[in-house]
Amino acid sequence: MDLRLGDSREVLKDIKNESIDMVITSPPYDDLRNYNNTLKWNFGVFKDIADQLFRVVKQGGVIVWIVGDKTYKGSETGTSFKQALYFKEIGFNLHDTMIWHKPNSFNFGSNNCYKQSFEYMFIFSKGRPKTMNLIKDIPSKMAGKTLKGARKHA
């Protein structure tokens, strides 16, 4: 395993073409965080990184892209979907989409909108994925059942 830490715009330049099997990342989006005033994350920066990812990911490789959207003036930005569509535009397949529920978040927000307590996990593949291990649900004895009475769980 080769783990790299740094600014993706710089780190990706040093990686050989079609040499990466898998990328897992949750990049900044919609300027929700301040990174020491060093990076203004915008669609141009995203496109540069996505283009480099297409160059370095092998045929059959995958990217797990975890991203959300900011709500601004009562409307979600749609950044996550714009990014997903751009990945498709440059040649990746949108293999799967999952929802990641963020722990310790509340579902209520302000301004007549629910707070985003989740992010999208887009799974992109370059061609057909070489390996895929589907997540299997853990069976629950209580699934589909209702409890009656005043019994409380402690």
Regions found by a protein language model. Give the residues of each.
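Core catalytic lobe of class I
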Residues: 1-154
